[in-house]
Every structure is written in C-alpha cells, then in structure tokens.
Amino acid sequence: MKLKILILALIFVAGASFTILTQKEWPVPDKYNKMPNPLKGDAASLATGKELWAKHCQSCHGKSGKGDGSKAAQLKTTPEDLSTSEMQKQTDGALFYKTLEGREDMPSFKKKIPDQDDIWALVNYMRTLKK
C-alpha cells in the first residue's frame, strides 16, 4: 500500500514538473503591461466578469481558475492556473492583453467579447480567483 502511494506521488510530481517546464513564457508588450484597468472591481463589474467567466473561460480554466475545466484534458497545452501567486502578480494590463490576443489553445476574445470594458470586468473577476 505504501509503495502504491509513493508511486502515485512520484507520478503526480513528475506530471506537475512537466507542466511547469512546458509552459512557455508569454511576453506582453510594455503598452499593455503598463495599461491601467479603467474599471473598479465593484459589484457590477465582478458580476459581469463572473458571467463572462462562466460563458467563455470556465470550460478550460475551471470554476475556480485552477486550469481543471471540463475541456482542459482535450487541449494540447495546459490551461494556466489563475489562482497562483505567479499569475496574480501579473498586471491587469497583462491579463487584459492575454485575454484579448490569446495564443495556442487559448483563443483570442477580440470578437467574442468585443466590448473592452467587459474584458476589464473579466480581469477584475480573475483577481477573485487567488488562493
């Protein structure tokens, strides 16, 4: 029994390490890194962000943003865990840019969410996902 637990723990650590190593750096232009969020994280903004999260993001990133959504296993790349301190350290502008532009399995939301204030509301909601 102890051997099974040890083997499972090693598999988990190896898988987590592989995921970390395979995450490519995602450079963000300075213009976006320095861009301030024009929306306050008030109740209305968070409600809009939560609704957009459920509609557009939850299937890959999961309800709590850990990258464990129902479609995550079908993707070539692992969805980011938005609850980590590393993700939460990113500027609002960086999160806005990544949502707007997308890359690889992460789609661009320029057309799906054409109102930029809605993307900013989504960024505000992402801030609530921290551990």
Where are these regions (language model features)?
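Electrostatic cytochrome c docking/interface patches
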Residues: K24-L52
